[in-house]
Amino acid sequence: KNHIRAFKEAEDAGIPFDCESVPDDLKKYPARNNPYWSEYYEFDLPSDNQGLGAFFDANGDGKYDPCEGDYPAIEEKGCPTESNFPDEIVFWVYNDAGNSHTNTNGKPIRMEVQVQAFAYATNDQINDMTFYRYKLINRAVTSIDSTYFGMWVDPDLGCSEDDFIGSDTSRSLMYVYNQDELDGDSGCDCTTGSTTYCDEVPVLGVDYFRGPLAPVRQRDTFMIGDPLLLDKQEYPNIYDTLEVLNDTMFILDLDHRMELGMSSFTYHVRQGAGSWPGAMWDPQTDIEFYRYLSGSWRDGTRYTFGGSGFNVGPGSQVIDYAVTGAPSNNNDWSMCSANLGKMDPRTVQATGPFRLDPG
């Protein structure tokens, strides 16, 4: 904000802006055509249509230069970048093709993820929040069908051994709270050695604000041989817009897109935290990670209503969102009302399925 203010003051006064006053952090920002980047890092930024770090382009030349009044901003559709800047912003990029997959033992799919983390200095609750924006880019040459995007959180609230989690589907919210009034599995002490909050226990929430955009589906079921598949007048580009997900064929309206919210909320537990079955443990292989993302337990069993959500047998009600009740209401389904005990839960707020095309 000091940089923005200083540039504006120089501009209003009709005097040259002192480029030496620009903080190094702004000159190191990885935005398109940053002329100072190579001075610090001795290599050039890639030239890419995605543009890397988003910024406000003061003179509209498509190039980032803080000495010309440019500054980092939040890339958000429908929001002008000029007024959409936080007090602090961090940008980073990672991909799944640069090294071996030691957690999943899976194969790379050439997915790039660009992340903006940012925060605001305010006098209200926003001061206690941090925000994260993720951009997923398919760098492969083929589309990825049945894509799921998930926010994974290991929400250790002080001592991890006495945590419960829940979800509020009306807000796409995950929250973690303590099992009782003291943080710790032995009074205010924790067997893992973690520092506890003792009798000043907070609550943490992760809000899934917005999901990815996907083409609107005009028809949700088709059979092979359906005459509409041959109707080139009603669907002139039909063979370019077919999508098959979970054995169902869709026609996609590529001119209109809808926002996909949180389609499932799942959790799993650390092995050794309680005596829970192996189907509820942390994933170890690529298919197990995918199952949690797509709303199933580690072994493919669907989540069901009540208890821990792992209820094998006929008559169980299949669900997409686990523990959705208010912990303060014993008649609602929550980990508190189910009295689940020790488990150290980790959560997944997911969106899908959708098709992610290259680029």
Language model features with spans:
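Extracellular/surface-associated beta-sandwich interaction domains
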Residues: 1-358
